[in-house]
C-alpha cells in the first residue's frame, strides 16, 4: 500500500459542505493524501467550530483536484467501498499516532 500524506500546514484551508437540507457547515482540511492502490486522492475534514475539548468526527472523501490542485466541495465523492474505507481509516490512524505528522 502506497500513500502520500500532505499534512495541513496552513490553518486557513477550509471548505464549506452543504447537507441534504441546505445547511452549510465550515470544515477544516486535516490532510490530503493520494493512494496509488486506488488511483485516487483523498481529503479528511473536521468541523471548524469544534473546541479543543470536544470529540471530533473526521469525515473523509475522495476528490478530484481543481486546476490548481486544490480541493473544492464540488469535487468531493463519498467513499462507499468497505476496503477503500478501511484503507482511509488506516491512513488516518497512522496520521493520528505519528507526532511528526499530526503536529502534536
Curated annotation (Swiss-Prot):
* Any Pfam family the entry gives: DUF1292
Instruction: Report which superkingdom the organism of origin falls in.
Output: Bacteria
Family under the similarity heading: Belongs to the UPF0473 family.
Q: Which HAMAP family match?
A: UPF0473
Protein name, UniProt field: UPF0473 protein LGAS_0424
Amino acid at each position: 500500500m502506497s500513500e502520500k500524506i500532505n499534512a495541513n500546514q496552513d490553518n486557513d484551508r477550509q471548505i464549506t459542505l452543504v447537507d441534504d437540507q441546505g445547511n452549510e457547515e465550515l470544515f477544516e482540511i486535516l490532510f490530503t493524501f493520494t493512494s496509488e492502490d486506488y488511483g485516487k486522492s483523498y481529503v479528511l475534514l473536521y468541523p471548524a467550530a469544534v473546541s479543543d475539548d470536544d470529540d471530533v468526527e473526521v469525515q473523509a472523501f475522495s476528490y478530484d483536484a481543481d486546476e490548481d490542485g486544490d480541493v473544492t466541495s464540488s469535487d468531493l465523492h463519498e467513499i462507499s467501498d468497505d476496503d477503500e474505507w478501511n484503507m482511509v481509516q488506516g491512513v488516518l490512524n497512522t496520521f493520528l499516532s505519528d507526532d511528526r505528522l499530526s503536529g502534536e
